């Protein structure tokens, strides 16, 4: 809100005086003596016009000098313009928040453009790991923020239910089934050793007895494959419910083969002369588009590679009418991006259609010791176990608060702490404090009138809090532009910090001064609205009591 206001005013001056349009930054300066907000507009324009940036800054300041939105405007250094906002402008933020309530921060930047976020996608060969958990929360927050900015968002999970890993899963379950019946069977090389398969095998023994003891054929393979898939997918959906996540679409890889999409795409690629046969396999001419080796699409035994089905999947996304798709992948899949871009180009799909957001790995820390994890070895902490230990709110907030590009160390002890050192507790406590103020006001006989006496707000702590409230929609845009949910958690920490400072330094509910109390309660209410909205976008509760 505040950034939009200043951007519009500065842009109008630049257009009127210099007949130019430029992109420039507006941000909170590092020190309070530099004002409430600062811009580099003069320096950006100076590069374009080949003029002295301070002279341009002086012209901008001169044009805005009488504007009631500013107490004063100063030029610093080579041409930074520092704005000291008027109380009138800041009070307008509180008024707007109170008027719009949960709609505050919502914009129509996206104009209903149809986009898709695909995330959480995993081989259904075992429970979700904590790494999957991080990806799910990144996807959830980005989906919510893009919806808030006016995009038509579809959340989708891709189920890798075709391919060699599913056969390995069936063989692993069959081995566990036989072991329970007293038959010595080894888990196949590269198979799955987790205890979850023992539980499924135990249920199978109860249901069918020893019917398939030491018996393996296509029928048995299909039975064990479907049993494992159904049980694990059901368990994964239970975990999603526990973490508070849901998807609009669960898309089966197998369906792409069954409905002919893979063959359709393969024919398209052949018609475009971007595939060839070698050693009995079908290859994509990746090297015709990027500096990388060609890749196999169909193996010599006639089975499709994961690359082939993935190309078909994204072709189908395009045909479903998405303007852009965003896949969220672990950083170990970065090598798959260029070849997928090449495949999209081969299908004549626009360059900006397919986008990938990478995230780094997660390490768990408990009692200052690192907990190590591995899916196939069966020795890993599941997302369910983490949720059971620290709770949904902490899991969601902690996964959101680290830049996706940064390796994350999840401190279990900190996540469980009921103290102000715990970031999620710190923000939630600010929200609970606000609601306690209204209970306190009622007990003390202070009548609350929404939107009244805002003209009494204006001390330093109130100004900082009002300014921070006015940055909310700017932060949402930053989250979307940078694909960085941590921008939102950083903002909520800052907003909570400014509220705690306001709460600690000033008497908010004072029966001897009802009008000032009312003004401060309005500021507190506006803060509560934004805290609650921000937490909701992350999928975290906003308790009224703690």
From Swiss-Prot:
One of its GO terms (biological process) is arginyl-tRNA aminoacylation. GO terms for molecular function: arginine-tRNA ligase activity; ATP binding. Its EC number is 6.1.1.19. The keyword Ligase applies. A motif ('HIGH' region) lies at residues 122-132. It catalyses: tRNA(Arg) + L-arginine + ATP = L-arginyl-tRNA(Arg) + AMP + diphosphate. It is found in: Cytoplasm. The keyword Transmembrane does not apply. GO terms for cellular component: cytoplasm. It comes from the Bacteria. InterPro entries: aa-tRNA-synth_I_CS, Arg-tRNA-ligase, Arg-tRNA-synth_N, Arg-tRNA-synth_N_sf, ArgRS_core, DALR_anticod-bd, Rossmann-like_a/b/a_fold, tRNAsynth_Ia_anticodon-bd. Keywords: Aminoacyl-tRNA synthetase, ATP-binding, Cytoplasm, Ligase, Nucleotide-binding, Protein biosynthesis. Pfam families: Arg_tRNA_synt_N (PF03485), DALR_1 (PF05746), tRNA-synt_1d (PF00750). Belongs to the class-I aminoacyl-tRNA synthetase family. Monomer. This is Arginine--tRNA ligase. The gene is argS.
């Amino acid at each position: 809100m505040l950034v939009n206001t200043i951007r519009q005013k500065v842009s109008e001056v630049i257009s009127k005086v210099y007949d130019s349009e430029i992109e420039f930054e507006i941000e909170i300066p590092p020190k309070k003596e530099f004002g409430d907000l600062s811009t580099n507009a003069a320096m950006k324009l100076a590069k374009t016009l080949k003029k002295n940036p301070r002279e341009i800054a002086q012209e901008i300041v001169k044009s805005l000098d009488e504007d009631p939105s500013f107490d004063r405007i100063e030029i610093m250094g080579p041409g930074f313009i520092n704005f000291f906002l008027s109380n009138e402008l800041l009070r307008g933020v509180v008024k707007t928040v109170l008027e719009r309530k949960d709609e505050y921060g919502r914009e129509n930047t996206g104009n209903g453009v149809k986009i898709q976020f695909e995330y959480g996608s995993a081989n259904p060969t075992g429970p979700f790991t904590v790494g999957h958990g991080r990806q799910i929360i990144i996807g959830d927050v980005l989906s919510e923020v893009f919806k808030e900015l006016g995009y038509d968002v579809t959340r989708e999970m891709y189920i890798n239910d075709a391919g060699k890993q599913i056969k390995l899963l069936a063989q692993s379950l069959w081995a566990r089934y036989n072991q329970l019946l007293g038959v010595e069977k080894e888990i196949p090389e590269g198979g799955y050793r987790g205890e979850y398969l023992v539980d499924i095998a135990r249920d199978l023994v109860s249901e069918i007895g020893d019917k398939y003891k030491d018996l393996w054929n296509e029928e048995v393979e299909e039975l064990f494959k479907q049993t494992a898939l159904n049980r694990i997918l059901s368990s994964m959906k239970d975990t999603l419910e526990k973490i508070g996540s849901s998807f609009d679409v669960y898309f089966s890889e197998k369906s792409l083969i069954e409905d002919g999409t893979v063959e359709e795409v393969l024919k398209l690629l052949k018609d475009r002369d971007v595939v060839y046969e070698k050693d009995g396999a079908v290859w994509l001419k990746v090297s015709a588009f990027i500096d990388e080796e060609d890749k196999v699409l169909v193996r010599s035994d006639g089975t499709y590679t994961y690359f082939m089905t993935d190309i078909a999947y994204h072709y189908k996304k395009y045909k479903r009418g998405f303007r852009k798709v965003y896949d969220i992948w672990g950083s170990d899949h970065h090598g798959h991006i260029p070849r997928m871009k090449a495949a999209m180009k081969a299908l004549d799909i626009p360059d900006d259609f397919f986008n990938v957001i990478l995230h780094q790995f997660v390490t768990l820390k408990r009692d200052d010791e690192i907990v190590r994890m591995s899916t196939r070895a069966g020795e890993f902490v599941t997302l369910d176990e983490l949720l059971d230990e620290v709770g949904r709110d902490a899991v969601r907030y902690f996964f959101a608060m680290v830049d996706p590009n940064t390796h994350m160390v999840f401190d279990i002890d900190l996540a469980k702490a009921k103290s102000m050192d715990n970031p999620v507790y710190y923000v939630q406590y600010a929200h609970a404090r606000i609601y306690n103020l209204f209970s306190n006001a009622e007990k003390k006989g202070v009548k609350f009138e929404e939107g009244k006496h805002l003209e009494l707000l204006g001390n330093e702590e109130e100004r900082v809090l009002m300014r921070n409230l006015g940055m909310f929609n700017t932060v949402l845009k930053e989250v979307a532009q940078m694909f960085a949910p941590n921008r939102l958690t950083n903002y909520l920490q800052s907003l909570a910090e400014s509220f705690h400072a306001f709460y600690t330094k000033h008497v908010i509910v004072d029966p001897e001064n009802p009008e000032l109390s009312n003004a401060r309660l309005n500021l507190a209410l506006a803060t509560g609205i934004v805290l609650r909205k921000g937490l909701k976008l992350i999928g975290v509760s906003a308790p009224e009591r703690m």
